[in-house]
Regions:
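Nuclease catalytic cores that cleave nucleic-acid phosphodiester bonds
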Residues: 2-146
Length: 146
């Protein structure tokens, strides 16, 4: 088992490191730059080319069945699931075969609604302590299931 983190704008890198260290699981932090290296030997920083979806492409090509990917990118999560991996969002939501279709459809609907009203105010929810707690519990659950 290996954990991959789609690291751009990911607020749970330290939490992944804590859980992975406890379970002695290697982690790859994939980004197109700007990530501080960890002194922890299980942590590996992978810098990909700049450009849209470069980190996603790397992760999708690298994972094997049983790996876990931390990402908020739903199309990447769908590819992970197709390849036998597990996907978890940084708020603790586990993306599965059963819910990925609905999540993709909702994402597409929301994209269409936002483009229909370019003046609509973006309402990005702040990452909270309860999100962090949900994430830690869900990651622990995924690891124990694997």
């Amino acid at each position: 088992m290996h954990i991959y983190v789609d690291a751009d704008a990911c607020p749970v890198k330290k939490e992944v490191e804590q859980v992975a260290t406890r379970h002695a699981i290697n982690v790859s932090i994939v980004s197109n730059g700007g990530i501080r290296p960890s002194q922890n030997p299980i942590m590996r920083i992978i810098v990909v080319d700049k450009g849209p979806d470069e980190a996603d492409k790397y992760i999708a090509n690298a994972i094997i069945a049983g790996d876990i990917v931390v990402t908020a990118d739903i199309p990447l999560a769908a590819r992970v699931i197709e390849n036998g991996g597990s996907a978890i969002k940084h708020n603790g939501e586990i993306i599965t075969e059963n819910n990925v279709g609905n999540i993709l459809a909702m994402r597409d609907l929301m994209t269409d609604l936002r483009s229909a009203d370019p003046f609509a105010k973006q309402n990005h929810k702040q990452f909270s302590k309860s999100d962090k707690s949900r994430f830690l519990n869900a990651l622990e659950k995924l690891i124990q299931q694997s």
